[in-house]
Amino acid sequence: LLTPGFVDSHVHVLGGGGEGGFANRTPEATMEGLTKFGVTTVVGCLGTDGIGRDMCALVAKTKGLNEQGMSAYCYTGSYQIPVRTLTDSIVKDIMMIQEIIGTGEIAISDHRSSQPTFEEFARVVADTRLGGVLSGKAGIVNVHLGDSPRCLDLIERVVDETEIPASQILPTHINRNEMLFGKSIEYALKGGAVDFTGNEDIDYWETICDEVRVCNGIKRMLDAGVNPDRMTISSDGQGSLPMYSSDGEFLGMGVGQSSCLLKEVKECVFKTEIPLEIAISTITSNPADILHLKGKGKVE
């Protein structure tokens, strides 16, 4: 069976973590660690820590992966607003830095976010779109969704109250909990793209952490009438994953891995009987099309 190389659209290529202190920082992604799991295209991002890791280092890491043969891109910014850019301008970063295709991962509905106002968030999306228009890139804002009951409120307001289309925003971690997932179905039915976060230990995150299992979530979206082209799966690779027992006891710190992509696709096919062509598109053609990655995600 021949498939395109996988597109992992959300990877902390510089490493993630740090939320428990400096000793909790996770290692960088490596060429071998990506390709051995079938990933040939990667989009790097910064997360909670936009200080100890910055845009100079992220762009340099992205360039290095490209020199090794990976098709590597990145977002400008991190969780925070105002966005910490390379050139002091979102528009300029996207226009003038070849590897930068959008902004992210901007955090909302999360205690670790900057608690941005609607106006602040809308301006980030608008500037990102303009940068994309002027450079021929996607101009996507990759949005981290947390546990707050506000869910996708800011995203929905941008789509409803401005002229900016839903195609400029890609919310991720939509399977974090049942409430957020339900809201994400509604958003996707309006045409928005959504990104599931895959897991290496699928049973743990479903049973202990109450996440929506990716294969079940995709099946539910398909049954609800969501366009299959609007769904993607990413790994949150190299991100820190605190592990707890059912009693809440801390068991240790895991690290996100791109290996979860193929595991999740297999579950879609064998557990929920989703057609292979739909399942595999979530890590190939769908992210490539949504992010305007030309020549990626398909075998032609």
Language-model region placement:
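Short amphipathic alpha-helices and their capping/turn segments at secondary-structure boundaries
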Residues: L1, M31, S89-I94, C215-N227
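Metal-associated gating/positioning segment near the N- to mid-region
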Residues: L2-A60
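Divalent metal-coordination and catalytic microenvironments
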Residues: H10, G38, L65, H144, ...
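Histidine/acidic-residue-rich, glycine-tolerant segments that coordinate divalent metal ions
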Residues: L46-S184
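Active-site core of metal-dependent hydrolases
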Residues: D127-P242, F250-L251
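His/Asp/Glu-enriched, well-ordered alpha-helical/loop segment
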Residues: D223-E300
